[in-house]
Structures are given as C-alpha cells and as structure tokens.
Amino acid sequence: MALLSSPLCEFGKKMPEFVLKDLNDKSFNSKNLENYDGILIFFICNHCPYVKAIIKKLVMTALDLKKYNVISIAIMPNDTIRYPEDNFENMKKFSEINNFSFPYLIDHDQDIAKKFDAVCTPDFFGY
C-alpha cells in the first residue's frame, strides 16, 4: 500500500464484515466477534518501515487491550507478488519473531482493506 493520509475517524460506523485466512490457513469470520467489548483492526505488512518502527509497542498494546475484552486483529493487504517480503510464509515468520498474540490475516485482493477505507500501513480502525 502506498503512503497516503488515512480518512478521519467515523464514530458509530458499523464494522465491515469479512472472512479471511489466518496463518493456519483457516477461515476467520468477523461475525464471531460479538462477545468482545471492543475490536481493534489494524492493517500492517512485514516490509513497511512504519510498521517495523511500532510493532513491539503494537504487540504490547494488543496484550493490554485483552484485559478490557478488546480483541486486536492484524490484516495484511499487500500484493505479495510486488512485495515478496509480505508473502504468507514471511507473515508467519514476522508473527513468530514479534510474538503476535492476535490473528494475522491475509487480504490477497485488498477487498477488505477497501471496505475499511484503509489506505496505508499501518492503518487502525476501532469498533
């Protein structure tokens, strides 16, 4: 994803529904999130210098949010042909190296990123 300005927060906006593959190649359905008090969706990728700069803090924040029954979900929307560092195997490595405690999902065709109006990485959405 290119470097762009994210749109302003739209309070009260309904979260777009999605089904994406996780790192175990299993489907993750957003309809199964109703038992949480909050949802943090963040669009990240492995190669982005901005993501690399905040990843440790992001992982710690996701752990802290669990205490408040808030689930964090990472979505990787990049074209893995153009950015091989973001491919599925490298997503697994990135997740392991950084001790992700949250789902890391792949959005192969950027359909979900478009539904969220995500325009860059990292890009954050709270519900």
PLM features per residue range, with description:
Residues 1-31:
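N-terminal "domain-start" segment that seeds a small globular fold
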Residues 15-16, 39, 121-122:
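Short loop/turn microsegments at loop-to-beta-strand junctions
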Residues 30-54, 58:
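Short active-site neighborhood of thiol/selenol oxidoreductases, capturing the structured segment around
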Residues 37-38, 68-70, 100-102:
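Loop/turn elements at helix/coil->beta-strand transitions in domains of secreted/extracellular proteins
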Residues 53-96, 112:
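Structural microenvironment flanking redox-active thiols in thiol-disulfide oxidoreductases
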Residues 92-126:
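Short, internal strand/loop/helix patches
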